[in-house]
Amino acid sequence: MLKKEGKLSDEELINLLEKGQSSVKLLSSTIEIFRNFYKSAENVSEFEVQTSIKNLITLMHTELSRANVSVKFSGFNEQKVRQIENIIQQILLILIHNAKDSLVESYKDEPLKRIIEIKFRSFEDKCYIGVYDNGNGVSEQMSEKIFTWLNTTKKQGNGIGLYFAKKLAQEKLNGDVRLVNNAKPTVFELSFDINLKD
């Protein structure tokens, strides 16, 4: 209608259509996350944490390799847990993906500095997995609302990844996701019960 009335140039129309297409992709992504959240298998099983995380990194190998991001592990042992493995992997996928994006943005011309460190520790009846990156970090202002619906630090982000990561941890694992340190390094930590009650 606006094009017919001469109110939009070809360039403006193309820009408007591209924005509309981006909005559709964002909506589709949001729907997919909702679908996965509510349809995730919730089978409690015994597994080794280190093996589970290394399997996840193997699945992410192509994505991380293309971004020239390397991953280091520390503190891991043969700790076994009775938990919902795929939920833990979903949460870590979000945290690692965010760390990767931060490193790519922070070190555009210095790929050798793109390192993610995943640290493990256990205390009493809980496990803690920290995802560390040395990117630009999270501002103090954003730190206060980082887990709020539709808040994002990324240009192309949808602001729902960390929201769902925290929600999954709290509702499915009797755990939590916290921003432990907001810069140099940025540290997000997942905690969950070693022995989840059915």
What spans do the regions from the language model cover?
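Conserved DHp (HisKA) dimerization/phosphotransfer helix of two-component histidine kinases, i.e.
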Residues: 1-66
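Conserved catalytic submotifs in the C-terminal HATPase_c
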Residues: 70-80
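Conserved glycine-/histidine-rich ATP-lid loop and adjacent helix of the Bergerat-fold HATPase_c
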Residues: 164-174
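Conserved micro-motifs of the catalytic ATP-binding
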Residues: 40-43, 80-83, 153
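Acidic ATP/Mg2+-coordinating residue in the GHKL
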Residues: 133
